[in-house]
Curated annotation (Swiss-Prot):
<feature type="short sequence motif" description="DEAH box">
    <location>
        <begin position="206"/>
        <end position="209"/>
    </location>
</feature>
<comment type="similarity">
    <text>Belongs to the DEAD box helicase family. DEAH subfamily.</text>
</comment>
<dbReference type="GO" id="GO:0044423">
    <property type="term" value="C:virion component"/>
</dbReference>
<dbReference type="GO" id="GO:0003724">
    <property type="term" value="F:RNA helicase activity"/>
</dbReference>
<feature type="binding site">
    <location>
        <begin position="106"/>
        <end position="113"/>
    </location>
    <ligand>
        <name>ATP</name>
    </ligand>
</feature>
<keyword id="KW-0378">Hydrolase</keyword>
<dbReference type="GO" id="GO:0005524">
    <property type="term" value="F:ATP binding"/>
</dbReference>
<protein>
    <recommendedName>
        <fullName>Putative ATP-dependent RNA helicase R350</fullName>
        <ecNumber>3.6.4.13</ecNumber>
    </recommendedName>
</protein>
<keyword id="KW-0946">Virion</keyword>
<dbReference type="InterPro" id="IPR001650">
    <property type="entry name" value="Helicase_C-like"/>
</dbReference>
<dbReference type="InterPro" id="IPR027417">
    <property type="entry name" value="P-loop_NTPase"/>
</dbReference>
<keyword id="KW-0547">Nucleotide-binding</keyword>
<feature type="domain" description="Helicase C-terminal">
    <location>
        <begin position="495"/>
        <end position="661"/>
    </location>
</feature>
<feature type="compositionally biased region" description="Polar residues">
    <location>
        <begin position="17"/>
        <end position="29"/>
    </location>
</feature>
<dbReference type="GO" id="GO:0016887">
    <property type="term" value="F:ATP hydrolysis activity"/>
</dbReference>
<feature type="domain" description="Helicase ATP-binding">
    <location>
        <begin position="93"/>
        <end position="271"/>
    </location>
</feature>
<dbReference type="Pfam" id="PF00176">
    <property type="entry name" value="SNF2-rel_dom"/>
</dbReference>
Length: 817
C-alpha cells in the first residue's frame, strides 16, 4: 500500500455518519449561503475532500480490466448504457449539492457528449426550467450532438415521439451557439435575451480548448473579441449567480500555453488564478530552457483546482492497436543543403526587414520548412530549386499563399483570382517538368539494366536481416539506380516514405502540412516513379488516394468509405491515403499499418491528432490480433556533418520546430499531469487510467484529516495560499509503502445502561505499526484501534475495537437521471 505525507492509499465505509454536521459554501459575489448536509466545503474543511469522495462515491470505483486469454476486446459485446465514470459525474454535480462546475478531461472514446447529456437530464428532472446553452464548433452540431441527443436525452413517460428529438419538451431548453461563427458573440447574446434568467443556467462548452484558445487569442492580439465577450459574460454570470453551472469538455485541455488552463479554471472558479499570463507564469512556471510546472508550486496548483477536474483515460489501451514509434533523422544531400542554405539566408533577410518595420512576417521559416521536405532538381535554367515560384513574385498575399499550400478551401477575392491562377500554372509547370526529368533518368536506368524497382526489391528482400532502416540500405554499398540517388538528392524523406510504403504489409497513412508542391503533390510523383498511381487506375495494392481541402467534400466521403471498406482491409483497392491539416479532425481510418508524418509541427497536439486518425478505438478489429500493430514514422532532415564555413546554425528548421514543440509539450504535460493527480475521481478510476502510466492521486496527510479543525483545501488569496503547503507534492511530503493486514473491526455507536453498543463487525485494513484503520474497498483512513496497556483492544479474539478519528460527512441516496 502507498502512503503519502502520512496519508494513505487505503480508505472508510459510508456508514460512518455525522448527522449534526452542516456545511456552508459561500459562492463568490453572492450573499446567500448554500447549506447542505453531507458535503465538504473546500474553503472550510476542504482537506477532507479527497477522502470524502472515496467514502460517498465508492460504488463508482472502476474494477481492474481482466481479459480472458486470446479474447479479442473489440469483439466483446457491450450494452449501450452509461458507464460508471459517466454516472459519477452526474451524481457529483447533482443539483442538491454545492458543486456546480467541472472540466470533463475525458479521452477519445469515453462518450463525453453522453456524459454532458446525462447532466442535462439530471438538472431538467430537478428543475424543468433549467436553461442549457451548448457552445460548440459548427462541425459538431449534427455529429455528435444531434445524434447523441437523440440517443441519450431523457423522455417523460407521456412523450410518444421517440424518433424526433427536436419535438421533446426538454429539447426546447437547449440552445446551441457555434463559437467558431463570425457572429458567435451576437448569436450568444441573442440567445441570452430569450432566456428566463431567474431559472438556473448550465453552460456546456465542447472542445473547450478551441474556445479557450480563441479567448487567449482575443486577449493576446487585442484584435478580435467574439470569444472574449462570451467568456466574460459567462464568468460574470458565474460570479453573481449560485445556480450557474459550467461544464467544459476536452480531451486535450491546453494546446499552446498553460495559461489556457488558467483561463479555463478561472471560468469554473472565478479568481482562482492570476488573470495576467505574466503573473501566472511567474508563479507557476519555472524559468529555464525547458520550463515546466514549478515543483515548488505544484501542490498549490493542485489544491486550487480540487473539485474542478474529472479525468478518464477514454477507451482503454487494449482496444487500440499497438503503436511502434520511430523518429527518423535523415541527413540532407549536398544538393538539398545548398538550396536549403539559399532559403535560410533569404528568411533571415525577410525577418530582419520585418523587425525594422516592427512587424513579424507570416512566412516565418516557411521556405526552409518546405526545403526540408523537398527541393526541386536542376532541370534547366528556368526550373530548379533556387527559382521555385514564390507568391511574392506574383504579388499574392502571404496568408493566401500559405493557405493555398496547405490545401485549404479558399474564398479568393476577385482581385486575387487571376493572380492565383497564374501562380497555380507556374507551379503546375514546375511539377510537370520535374516529373519528366525524373522519368528521363528512369528510362536511362532501364537501358543500363538497373532501375529503382530493382532497388526496391533488394530493400524488401533484405529488410529486417541486412537492413533495419531505409537509411541503412541507402548508405550500404552495392549497385544503385541513378534515379534512387537523384530522388534522395531532392528529398530523403519522400524517398524513405516511398520505400517503407512499398514493403508495408497493409494500408499506409501519410500526413504533410503541405498539399501543394513540397508535400502531397511531389509525394504523388515519387509514388508514380515506383509504380503506384491514383487508385482509380492503379494495379492491386499499388493505389493511392488523397483527403484534403482541394478534394470536393462529397468525393472525400466516398474516398474515406472506399478506403475503410471491408474489401480493402489490406489495401488491395487503395493502399495509401495522403492527408493534410484539414483532416486532423473528423476522419477515422481503419486497419492502418504504417503512418508517416512527413514533418514536425509547432504543437505536439497537432501531431497526436494526426496519429489518432489511424489509431482509434477498435479501428483494427478486422485484422487478426497479431497484426494490430501500427509503425509510426516521424521524419526530420538534419544538416550534413560538414557545414558551410558561414553556417553558424547547426539545427535544421525541422529540428528547430520539433524542439519548440517538445518544449511546449513538456510544459503543458507537466500541468496536465498535475490535473490528473488532482482529479476528483483519481482514486476511483485509477484501475483504468493507470493502465499505461502510473502516478499518485492527490490527498492530504493523515495528520491533517484527523484533527478536530481540519482546515480548508486552499486559501482564497493566492499570496496566503503560497504558505499553506499541505498534501501531495508539498515540501515535506513523502511517499512510502506500508504493510497492512485484513481485520474485522467495530466502533461504538451508542450506549445502553452505560454499556457500549458497537457497530456490526466490518472488514478493514489495519496498520499494526501506527494503529490506523482504513476502508477495505477504497483505502481512506477511518480511525485508530484503541490500545489498553499497549495491546490492541478487542471485542473478541477476531474483532478489534476502533475509535473513529476521521469525521467524514455522508450524503445519502442519488439523484434521478
Amino acid at each position: 500500500m502507498n502512503r503519502r505525507n502520512r496519508s494513505n492509499d487505503l480508505n472508510p465505509e459510508p456508514s460512518i455518519e455525522n448527522p449534526n454536521n452542516q456545511i456552508a459554501e459561500e459562492f463568490p459575489g453572492n450573499n446567500s449561503v448554500y447549506k447542505s448536509d453531507g458535503y465538504v466545503d473546500l474553503k472550510n474543511n476542504g482537506r477532507l475532500f479527497p477522502i470524502w469522495i472515496l467514502k460517498n462515491f465508492k460504488q463508482y470505483k472502476l474494477p481492474e480490466i481482466i481479459r480472458k486469454e486470446n479474447e479479442d476486446p473489440c469483439n466483446v459485446q457491450v450494452k449501450l448504457e452509461l458507464r460508471k465514470y459517466q454516472e459519477f459525474v452526474g451524481q457529483y454535480l447533482n443539483p442538491q449539492g454545492p458543486y456546480t462546475s467541472i472540466l470533463l478531461y475525458h479521452g477519445l472514446g469515453s462518450g463525453k457528449t453522453a456524459s454532458a447529456i446525462n447532466l442535462m437530464n439530471i438538472l431538467y428532472n430537478y428543475d424543468n426550467g433549467t436553461n442549457f446553452i451548448v457552445l460548440i464548433k459548427a462541425s459538431l452540431h449534427n455529429d455528435p450532438w444531434m445524434q447523441d441527443l437523440k440517443e441519450w436525452l431523457g423522455r417523460d413517460p407521456s412523450e410518444q415521439n421517440v424518433d424526433n428529438v427536436t419535438k421533446l419538451d426538454r429539447y426546447k431548453n437547449i440552445h446551441f451557439v457555434h463559437y467558431d461563427s463570425p457572429f458567435a458573440d451576437s448569436s450568444f447574446m441573442s440567445v441570452i435575451k430569450t432566456l428566463d434568467l431567474s431559472k438556473p443556467t448550465m453552460y456546456i462548452i465542447d472542445e473547450a480548448h478551441n474556445f479557450i484558445r480563441n479567448v487567449y487569442s482575443n486577449i493576446n492580439s487585442k484584435l478580435g473579441k467574439r470569444a472574449k465577450v462570451i467568456y466574460e459574460y459567462i464568468m460574470k454570470d458565474k460570479r453573481e449567480n449560485k445556480n450557474t453551472r459550467i461544464v467544459l469538455i476536452s480531451a486535450t485541455p491546453a494546446i499552446n500555453t498553460p495559461f489556457e488552463l488558467a483561463l479555463m479554471f478561472n471560468l469554473l472558479r472565478p479568481g482562482i488564478f492570476p488573470s495576467s499570463e505574466l503573473d501566472f507564469n511567474r508563479t507557476f512556471v519555472t524559468e529555464s530552457s525547458y520550463p515546466i510546472l514549478n515543483p515548488m508550486k505544484k501542490n498549490m496548483f493542485e489544491r486550487r483546482i480540487l473539485g474542478l477536474v474529472s479525468y478518464y483515460i477514454g477507451a482503454t489501451p487494449d482496444l487500440y492497436a499497438r503503436q511502434e514509434l520511430k523518429y527518423i533523422n535523415l541527413p540532407m544531400s549536398a544538393y538539398q543543403y545548398d538550396i536549403y542554405r539559399i532559403f535560410e539566408k533569404l528568411e533571415a533577410e525577410i525577418q530582419e526587414r520585418a523587425r525594422r518595420r516592427g512587424k513579424q512576417s507570416q512566412l516565418y521559416r516557411t521556405y526552409t520548412r518546405q526545403a526540408c521536405n523537398f527541393v526541386f532538381p536542376y532541370v534547366n535554367m528556368n526550373v530548379n530549386g533556387e527559382l521555385r515560384p514564390r507568391p511574392g513574385k506574383f504579388r499574392l498575399s502571404e496568408k493566401l499563399a500559405d493557405d493555398f499550400s496547405k490545401g485549404k478551401n479558399l474564398d479568393v477575392p476577385d482581385t486575387e483570382k487571376e493572380i492565383l491562377n497564374k501562380y497555380t500554372k507556374a507551379i503546375e509547370n514546375y511539377l510537370n517538368e520535374t516529373e519528366r526529368y525524373f522519368q528521363n533518368i528512369n528510362k536511362k536506368d532501364a537501358e543500363n539494366g538497373r532501375t529503382i524497382i530493382n532497388d526496391l526489391d533488394e530493400f524488401k528482400k533484405g529488410f529486417g536481416t541486412k537492413f533495419n532502416s531505409f537509411l541503412q540500405y541507402y548508405q550500404s554499398e552495392g549497385p544503385r539506380s541513378s534515379l534512387l540517388t537523384e530522388m534522395y538528392n531532392c528529398s530523403p524523406k519522400m524517398l524513405a516514405i516511398a520505400f517503407m510504403t512499398y514493403i508495408s504489409p497493409g494500408k499506409v497513412m501519410i500526413y504533410s502540412n503541405y498539399v501543394v508542391m513540397e508535400g502531397i503533390d511531389v509525394m504523388k510523383i515519387y509514388f508514380r516513379l515506383i509504380g503506384f498511381n491514383d487508385f482509380t487506375i492503379a494495379r492491386e495494392y499499388m493505389g493511392y488516394c488523397e483527403y484534403h481541402g482541394r478534394i470536393d467534400p462529397k468525393d472525400r466521403v466516398r474516398i474515406k468509405n472506399m478506403f475503410n471498406d471491408k474489401n480493402n482491409v489490406y489495401g488491395n483497392k487503395c493502399k495509401v491515403i495522403m492527408l493534410s491539416p484539414s483532416a486532423t479532425e473528423g476522419i477515422q481510418l481503419l486497419d492502418i499499418r504504417q503512418e508517416h508524418i512527413m514533418e514536425p509541427y509547432w504543437t505536439e497536439v497537432r501531431i497526436q491528432q494526426v496519429i489518432g486518425r489511424g489509431v482509434r478505438q477498435c479501428s483494427h478489429r478486422d485484422l487478426p490480433m497479431s497484426e494490430r500493430i501500427v509503425d509510426i514514422y516521424r521524419y526530420k532532415v538534419i544538416k550534413p556533418e560538414n557545414l558551410d564555413p558561414d553556417d553558424t546554425v547547426r539545427q535544421s528548421t525541422d529540428e528547430y520546430v520539433e524542439d519548440q514543440a517538445k518544449s511546449k509539450a513538456n510544459l503543458i504535460e507537466s500541468f496536465l499531469g498535475a490535473m490528473k493527480e488532482a482529479a476528483v475521481d483519481c482514486e476511483l478510476f485509477k484501475e483504468h487510467n493507470m493502465m499505461s502510466q502510473s502516478y499518485y492521486c492527490f490527498k492530504f496527510p493523515e495528520s491533517a484529516v484527523t484533527k478536530t479543525n481540519v482546515g480548508p483545501a486552499y486559501r482564497e488569496d493566492i499570496k496566503d495560499d503560497v504558505k499553506y503547503d499541505s498534501g501531495l507534492n508539498s515540501k515535506n511530503s513523502i511517499v512510502e509503502r506500508i504493510r497492512v493486514v485484513k481485520v474485522n473491526a467495530v466502533y461504538q455507536i451508542n450506549t445502553d445502561n452505560n454499556n457500549p453498543v458497537y457497530s456490526s463487525p466490518t472488514k478493514y485494513w489495519y496498520n499494526k505499526k501506527t494503529g490506523m484503520v482504513y476502508d477495505f474497498e477504497t483505502h481512506y483512513p477511518v480511525g485508530q484501534v484503541e490500545f489498553i496497556d499497549n495491546l490492541p483492544n478487542k471485542l473478541d479474539k477476531d474483532t478489534y475495537i476502533m475509535r473513529i478519528d476521521v469525521i467524514i460527512p455522508s450524503i445519502t441516496g442519488s439523484v434521478n437521471t
